[in-house]
UniProtKB/Swiss-Prot annotation:
Catalytic activity: testosterone + 3 reduced [NADPH--hemoprotein reductase] + 3 O2 = 17beta-estradiol + formate + 3 oxidized [NADPH--hemoprotein reductase] + 4 H2O + 4 H(+); androst-4-ene-3,17-dione + 3 reduced [NADPH--hemoprotein reductase] + 3 O2 = estrone + formate + 3 oxidized [NADPH--hemoprotein reductase] + 4 H2O + 4 H(+)
Cofactor annotation: heme
UniProt-recorded name of the protein: Aromatase 3
Protein's membrane topology: Peripheral membrane protein
Taxonomic lineage of the native organism: Eukaryota, Metazoa, Chordata, Craniata, Vertebrata
PROSITE patterns for this protein: CYTOCHROME_P450
Pfam short name (any one): p450
Tissue specificity field: Ovary.
Subcellular location: Membrane
Keyword Heme: yes
CDD domains assigned: CYP19A1 (cd20616)
This protein's UniProt keywords: Heme, Iron, Membrane, Metal-binding, Monooxygenase, Oxidoreductase
UniProt-annotated binding residues for heme: C435
Length: 501
């Protein structure tokens, strides 16, 4: 019996069984450790697992790799319309549910945005300006200047100023035409937006072409640096080109603002020229704002329209070119309401088809389709507990394709044939941190469409359309400008023929 126990075959069998049971025990122990490790991070909100900190790294990397907008759509599709990830190690909710979005937008404790502090410092937005100013007190101090400039007399003046600008630029269309006669619509729109903004808010002669290029460089830097981890800023050569782009625009704007300061100091009468920049400069003189904050506010006011609205109108023109029945409806209303005369402020409320077209374009092909916020106090949203300091991304573009609209995945004016409750359609947001320029933006888009479409019919190259266009959905959704076929054909209209509609 002793010999049998010492038999090599029996010893091997015992060793194999011991290894098997030992392996199972180790796996169970690892599983227990993982469960204990993740226990504190377990959330009732759907989302990827923590996995010893690997989950947060993967989710942050996905935002850097795919872009903010694309990553939000990916995660909402994967985990539902109210889900949780991590950005920079911080818990971040991605929400595309209308009731939750409505709750967040209307409450004051969600007025703060989030982003990399070092990234925002690099582009000059950390605790300055209005767009990504994360200091609620400083944000509240500058917002009234924007609200005043973008409403009241400024809103009334926008019609004439914008109409004059687009007429001027259409008269020299050869500047943005290539050798084949195709029009670079993006450059055209950016110049019109910049010129209009300058005439309304700054009033200093500038080099449109050079400044438009600098604005694009600044936006690229803003988009690239907004969510970068702190380690990125430890390696100077990684962000040097972005730093230069930011400096180029800041330096150019500082020269213009200094010229404005000089004109103010030597002017005998200012009553007729108390524009946005002048108001800020006087606030600086009273000690209410720093010089750096004034410069950043002016910079942001000047880049807002060339940055996003130019792309919005670009997409609209492509949609018009691809939907002739929509173009016919637009032209019928334009010639009924405006006719051959100059567009006026009292036309704005009468252009209902144009307005519905703008809304449907912004719903179907948004440029800014999400909003970033931070919870400033504990809350409960649709039954989910939300802790103070939680980052939140409101995926508005996805919401616009999930709820209410009869044909959410089609471009059709039928989607706005009836009044849409504002909780289901929020292209500009609402509540205390809604877009300050939402009313003036609507006026500007109406004026541009009416003025341009009365003079030209637009066509795309080789059947190009927004659905097939190569796009990047990061801080905003925009076309890949090197992909080709983005220029359009502008055909002069026969006014008499148009009036027959």
């Amino acid at each position: 019996m002793v010999l049998e126990m010492l038999n090599p075959m029996n010893i091997s069998s015992m060793v194999s069984e011991a290894v098997l049971f030992g392996s199972i025990a180790i796996l169970l122990l690892i599983g227990l450790l993982l469960w204990v490790w993740n226990y504190e991070d377990t959330s009732s909100i759907p989302g990827p697992g923590y996995f010893l900190g690997i989950g947060p790294l993967i989710s942050h990397f996905r935002f850097l790799w795919m872009g903010i907008g694309s990553a939000c759509n990916y995660y909402n599709k994967m985990y539902g319309e109210f889900m949780r990830v991590w950005i920079g190690g911080e818990e971040t909710l991605i929400i595309s549910k209308s009731s939750s979005i409505f709750h967040i937008m209307k409450h004051n404790h969600y007025t703060c945005r989030f982003g990399s502090k070092l990234g925002l410092e690099c582009i000059g937005m950390h605790e300055k300006g209005i767009m990504f100013n994360n200091n609620p007190a400083l944000w509240k101090a500058v917002r009234p200047f924007f609200t005043k400039a973008l409403s009241g007399p400024g809103l009334v003046r926008m019609v004439t100023v914008c109409a004059d600008s687009i007429t001027k630029h259409l008269d020299k269309l050869e500047e943005v035409r290539n050798d084949l006669g195709y029009v670079d619509v993006l450059t055209l729109m950016r110049r019109i937006m910049l010129d209009t903004s300058n005439n309304l808010f700054l009033g200093i002669p500038l080099d449109e072409s050079a400044l438009v290029h600098k604005v694009q460089g600044y936006f690229d830097a803003w988009q690239a640096l907004l969510l970068k981890p702190d380690i990125f800023f430890k390696i100077s050569w990684l962000y040097r080109k972005y730093e230069k782009s930011v400096k180029d625009l800041k330096d150019a704007m500082e020269i213009l603002i200094e010229e404005k300061r000089h004109r103010i100091s030597t002017a005998e009468k200012l009553e007729d020229s108390m524009d946005f920049t002048t108001q800020l400069i006087f606030a600086e003189k009273r000690g209410e704002l720093t010089k750096e904050n004034v410069n950043q506010c002016v910079l942001e006011m000047m880049i807002a329209a060339p940055d996003t609205m130019s792309i919005t109108v670009f997409f609209m023109l492509f949609l018009i070119a691809n939907h002739p029945q929509v173009e016919e409806e637009l032209m019928k209303e334009i010639y009924t309401v405006v006719g051959e005369r100059d567009i006026r402020n009292d036309d704005m409320q009468k252009l209902k088809v144009v307005e519905n077209f703008i809304y449907e374009s912004m719903r179907y092909q948004p440029v800014v389709d999400f909003v970033m916020r931070k919870a400033l106090e504990d809350d409960v949203i649709d039954g989910y507990p939300v802790k103070k300091g939680t980052n939140i991304i409101l995926n508005i573009g996805r919401m616009h394709r999930l709820e209410f609209f009869p044909k959410p995945n089609e471009f059709t004016l039928e989607n706005f044939a009836k009044n849409v409750p504002y909780r289901y359609f929020q292209p500009f947001g609402f509540g205390p941190r809604a877009c300050a320029g939402k009313y003036i933006a609507m006026v500007m888009m109406k004026v541009i469409l009416v003025t341009l479409l009365r003079r030209f019919q637009v066509q795309t190259q080789q059947g190009q359309c927004v659905e097939k266009m190569q796009k990047k959905n990061d801080l905003s959704l925009h076309p890949h400008e090197t992909s080709g076929l983005l220029e359009m054909i502008f055909i002069p209209r026969n006014s008499d023929k148009c009036l027959e509609h």
